[in-house]
């Protein structure tokens, strides 16, 4: 379903987004 698609997208995106956010904090 949609939630499982969003879950899979989050798993691929978060590892890239979190370090970028952390650098700005």
From Swiss-Prot:
It is found in: Secreted. Its main location: secreted. Contains two amphipathic alpha helix regions separated by a region of less-defined helicity and greater flexibility. The modification Leucine amide is found at residue 25. Keywords: Amidation, Amphibian defense peptide, Antibiotic, Antimicrobial, Secreted. GO terms for biological process: defense response to bacterium. Belongs to the frog skin active peptide (FSAP) family. Caerin subfamily. One of its GO terms (cellular component) is extracellular region. Pfam families: Caerin_1 (PF07440). Antibacterial peptide, that adopts an alpha helical conformation which can disrupt bacterial membranes. Each caerin displays a different antimicrobial specificity. This is Caerin-1.3. Expressed by the skin parotoid and/or rostral glands.
